[in-house]
């Protein structure tokens, strides 16, 4: 999966590396991610739970409990040996497990839930042999810039070089197994994704698993079946609890809780962590993303398990300023049309309606607002909006009823 001699990731290996962290070399090192669990944290000196600081609503007093490693689990009821152990049956973990299996590895895939889980509908990558290398390089620099120069350029380059092949591989596998997926090519890409700093010529493969309510989650259930038929051993309802390290300090396995007690999965070649985010761990979320304290959560049971295990094994979660991922307006398909925007709580206009959609949440972080606002427009919008050339995407009243039935 990872070429330790060359220090590079192969294109097929990218499918495994995409799972967030490959923790089989010299121990886990760094992990970028999100965070949330109980209120307050533990003081690193006393071990007691520290209360909220009360300063600007931040929970930053003492060492958070999720960073404190628990006692090692020693009551092991069963030990199993594999080449590769993947934790998390999602859109990263399942392709990683299947790819490793096809490469000849004996693979175990551990999943906390009773089925595969994944969200969203699309994934994109650049078709490198049909794209302008200068445009690809410009896009890589743009992504670093748009991330306030906090992104890892090397990680972005992995996506630039390998993303297209990886997405196409998944798309083809799901389609061949009967999943509902198509390639939308460049249709979902904005102008900024196709023409960067004057450089043109980017071509994308864009998988779309849909239409809704069908999603990536349904596609991953199909791919999980493909993986099982290929020889991957999938352990559902088997949450990973701790990573195991060998005498040299390298991660060499995973301890998970099975139906009859704790199981140790030894991994001769490596462990891949693909456990998703931490939006449902309140302590982690309030620690790393205090802006989201009053926002609702779209998902459930996403408690940063992989982040914690990697930290307990000696790794590091990326510093604060994690992405909020507040980019989904399922109930408002014309979010990018500058209709009057008012707060739900007060009915008052609160912003310049040309603000980028992903930034709107920054105006709505209070307990009263909790991320809620309304767009106001009348029935004449069907005649007016099409005349606003270059502004938003027009949606007919008939199509709007699909989202907001009377």
Locate predicted features.
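Beta1/beta-strand and adjacent pyrophosphate-binding region of the FAD-binding site
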Residues: 76-90
